[in-house]
Every structure is written in structure tokens, then in C-alpha cells.
């Protein structure tokens, strides 16, 4: 487990490129036959990926020890979205088949988690967010047909995109975790522009479905002190509550967003005019 401390906005704006990447970029999300795990002090979110190739992968008691509890989800809930080939997630002996673009919510209290791929030549890629939880809500698989979609933007502004809300109150109950997948239409490059902040929640973006020679310029920082981080395929970036979070790619791309914090009201945002940015 890699631990990232929280950082004040006054400090962040003084960092150079290497410093920004060290604080906010999650460079490697998937590594064959193991889990990756980044623990952020910002709202205590845990972010990572699991890619079983030649064997199944379980999250053992060593994580519980690092969290000061008996086991990983003793006081946490978990959201998983599969961006790879078909796979399975075994939760306390119950097996869920999770195909491409399908998701699984695992409620607080689940003890045994095991992840596997159905085809090692096309392994599953389970991207996950994990947040503190105060009670148990039922485990549930979510398919693309069950999500709450919202299409926004237009081609004139190069931001036509569909926001697929997987783990939001209108789809299923969670303690605080919200997750979804946003896909840009071909020829569109911008996400979340005009941009916003939300003082009451933090957010993590995970960019994928990108060509090897493409990138996304992820915009961050306070609205009057903007910075950027160059993102490659299958990388994630942490966004504190004080930071904008937007991006423009050299080609269309897809990203998963995850939020934790004070509430689960999707539209609880502090909107910013483009003319306010510096």
C-alpha cells in the first residue's frame, strides 16, 4: 500500500512538474497477478487496480493490518468497474461474473475477496475505489443497462459526452462512495469544461481507452492558479476538494470518476465560468 498525504493548495501551487506528479498522479494502476493500492489521506479514499492473468488475486489480511482493523472491508465499502475482459469476483463464497463495463458494489463487512479472469489472453482489469463506511448495504452487480446515463455538451465545444452513473443514489444505496464512467464521442476532446470544484467532496479520475501515442492534459489547481498533469492510458489522478478537475485529450478517451465526502448529490458543484480561470 502506498500512502499519499493531503496537501494544502498554497503548497501545491509552488510545485514543479515532478512535484505535481508525485503528489497527485497514480502512475501504475494495473500490474499482472497482483493488486495495486494507493491510500490517500484526502477523505481516506483507496484507489487501485487488479489484473489477474495466470492466477487469481485476493486481498488478504495484510491490508487490514495496515488499516488498523481485522480485514480490508471491516469499516469500508468497495466499488469495482471492469474495463478488461470477462472475469469473476468472489465475495465471501458468492461468485459474481463481471464482464466488460460491468461493476460490482461490495458492502461494508465483506471478509474474503478473490478476483479472477476467465481468459488469461484477455484478462479482466478491475479498477476500484474504496471508502470508509458506517453500515452495510447489499452487494450488487451493475450492468451498463442499469446505469443512469446523462449526455451533455456539444460537438461545437468539443465536449459531447455521456456520463454513465453506476454507483449513485438513484441506482443503489452506498454509504458515501459514488462512481461512474464518462465516455467522449469520437472527435470530442474536453471533459468537464466549463469546470467546477466541489468543496464538500474529493474526486479521483482514471483515464483509459487511449491510444499509446495519445495523452490527456488533466487540468487541476485552484481556479486562479491552474496547473496540468499529462496523463497516459490507464493512469489515475487525485483531485482535492479545492481543485478543478477537467481534461483535454489529443483524441477521444474514456474515464472513470469516483467521489467521496460530505454528500452524494451529483449536482452539488461550485460552477466556474471559463472567464474566471487563470
Curated annotation (Swiss-Prot):
Binding residue positions for Zn(2+): 196, 198, 203, 245
Record text on cofactor binding: Binds 1 zinc ion per subunit.
Any Pfam family matching the protein: KduI
Top-level taxon in the UniProt lineage: Bacteria
GO BP: D-galacturonate catabolic process; D-glucuronate catabolic process; pectin catabolic process
Catalytic activity: 5-dehydro-4-deoxy-D-glucuronate = 3-deoxy-D-glycero-2,5-hexodiulosonate
Cofactor names: Zn(2+)
Pathway connected to this protein: Glycan metabolism; pectin degradation; 2-dehydro-3-deoxy-D-gluconate from pectin: step 4/5
Record key words, sorted: Isomerase, Metal-binding, Zinc
EC number of the protein: 5.3.1.17
InterPro entries (alphabetical): KduI, KduI/IolB_isomerase, KduI_N, RmlC-like_jellyroll, RmlC_Cupin_sf
UniProt GO MF annotations: 4-deoxy-L-threo-5-hexosulose-uronate ketol-isomerase activity; zinc ion binding
Top-level EC class: isomerase
Function: Catalyzes the isomerization of 5-dehydro-4-deoxy-D-glucuronate to 3-deoxy-D-glycero-2,5-hexodiulosonate.
Family: Belongs to the KduI family.
Stated name of the protein: 4-deoxy-L-threo-5-hexosulose-uronate ketol-isomerase
Organism per entry: Edwardsiella ictaluri (strain 93-146)
Gene, per the UniProt record: kduI
Amino acid at each position: 500500500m502506498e500512502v499519499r498525504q493531503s496537501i494544502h493548495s498554497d503548497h501545491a501551487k509552488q510545485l514543479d512538474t515532478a512535484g505535481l506528479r508525485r503528489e497527485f498522479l497514480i502512475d501504475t494502476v494495473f500490474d499482472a497477478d497482483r493488486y495495486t493500492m494507493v491510500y490517500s489521506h484526502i477523505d481516506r479514499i483507496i484507489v487501485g487496480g487488479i489484473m489477474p492473468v495466470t492466477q487469481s488475486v485476493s486481498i488478504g489480511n495484510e491490508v487490514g493490518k495496515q488499516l488498523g482493523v481485522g480485514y480490508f472491508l471491516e469499516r469500508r465499502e468497495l466499488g469495482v468497474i471492469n474495463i478488461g475482459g470477462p472475469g469473476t469476483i468472489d465475495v465471501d463464497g458468492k461468485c459474481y461474473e463481471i464482464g466488460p463495463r460491468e461493476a460490482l458494489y461490495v458492502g461494508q463487512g465483506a471478509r474474503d475477496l478473490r478476483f479472477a479472469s476467465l481468459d488469461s489472453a484477455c484478462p479482466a482489469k478491475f479498477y476500484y475505489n474504496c471508502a470508509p463506511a458506517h453500515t452495510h448495504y447489499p452487494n450488487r452487480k451493475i450492468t451498463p443497462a442499469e446505469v443512469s446515463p446523462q449526455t451533455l455538451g456539444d460537438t461545437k465545444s468539443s465536449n459531447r459526452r455521456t456520463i454513465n452513473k453506476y454507483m449513485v443514489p438513484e441506482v443503489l444505496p452506498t454509504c458515501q462512495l459514488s462512481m461512474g464512467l464518462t465516455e467522449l464521442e469520437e472527435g470530442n476532446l474536453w471533459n468537464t469544461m466549463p469546470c467546477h470544484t466541489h468543496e464538500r467532496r474529493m474526486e479521483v479520475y482514471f483515464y483509459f481507452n487511449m491510444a499509446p501515442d495519445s495523452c490527456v492534459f488533466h487540468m487541476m489547481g485552484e481556479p486562479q492558479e491552474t496547473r496540468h498533469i499529462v496523463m497516459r492510458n490507464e493512469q489515475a489522478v487525485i483531485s482535492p476538494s479545492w481543485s478543478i478537475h477537467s481534461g483535454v485529450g489529443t483524441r477521444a478517451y474514456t474515464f472513470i470518476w469516483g467521489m467521496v465526502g460530505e454528500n452524494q448529490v451529483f449536482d452539488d458543484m461550485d460552477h466556474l465560468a471559463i472567464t474566471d480561470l487563470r
